[in-house]
Amino acid sequence: MKGTIAVNLTNGFGNNIFQYSAARLLAEHLDSDLVLIPPTKNYYGIKELENLGIKFVEKKLNNPINVIDKNYKMCYNDVLKGRDVILSGYFEDYTIYFDKLDQIKNWFKPVKNRKDNSLTIHMRTGDRLFMKNEFYTKPRAEHYLKAVEKFDFDELHIVTDMPKWDYVTADELNNMKFHLDVPANERVPIGESVKFFNEFIEGFEKYNPNVQKRSIVDDFNFIRASDNILFEHGTLSWWAAAISDAKKVGVYGPWRPWKGDKNKNLSNIPLKNWFKWE
């Protein structure tokens, strides 16, 4: 009788790609069924993931073994064949996926590389413009611009969660709704957030960037189809770049430095076409 590998999805599309990939790799290794458990019945990510070709099925689990990040790799053991396992974690460790990227790429609907010699920057702003715990370690516009100089490209695209790509005022930024609501005691002064974002608008004006509003899946696939990719520490953009045919990829080397010892190794993946920027 087949076992089942189930995984608890958390909030966040990029997180879900990691969770799905970790669960499916293990399920295929153990010849088990795969079950994805959304955080809520109305979770926005269900439709987005289904649009990628990921299926949601329900199955009752029988006395499942609970597995978290730190003991995930130990599950590649045939003694677990036929058993039910439930994964709970983020599984953000490039060594799990590095030598299986071609296999993982085949799980997703193919996208055609645009071959327009463009550079696509994924810029997660939104709620992260307010978060005090990470704001003062974030790369500024000048750091992005130095990284951009490492690419040879004809046009620039910016993929972002900002409702508009233009100068903002404090009132406008305060009234914008994002992925998460940041409590007042965890926010930086609004003036600093405004200055931070407006520096990007000013700095990138010379490139006349193309900025369009898309769905999460369309953003993911747009990045995947790019010749050149630059991003900071987004899990969505990490996966989009990892399974792309991009000629060159720049990833922010420190990744998420404010996490200290809990920082992940994702920027260290030794892919030949990737480089680190700071």
Locate each region found by the language model.
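Donor-binding and catalytic core of enzymes assembling or modifying cell-surface/extracellular glycoconjugates
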Residues: 13, 154-266
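A short, glycine/small-residue-rich beta-strand->loop->alpha-helix junction that serves as a flexible
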Residues: 9-18, 136
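Nucleotide-activated donor-dependent transferases that construct or modify glycoconjugates
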Residues: 1-11
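A structural signal for short, well-ordered beta-strand segments and their strand-loop junctions
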Residues: 6, 33-39, 120-122, 157-159, ...
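Acidic, PIN/NYN-like endoribonuclease modules and their adjacent C-terminal/linker elements
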Residues: 263-278
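Histidine-anchored nucleotide/phosphate-binding helix
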Residues: 16-28, 144-148
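Secretory-pathway luminal glycosyltransferase catalytic domains
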Residues: 3, 39-153, 161-166, 172, ...
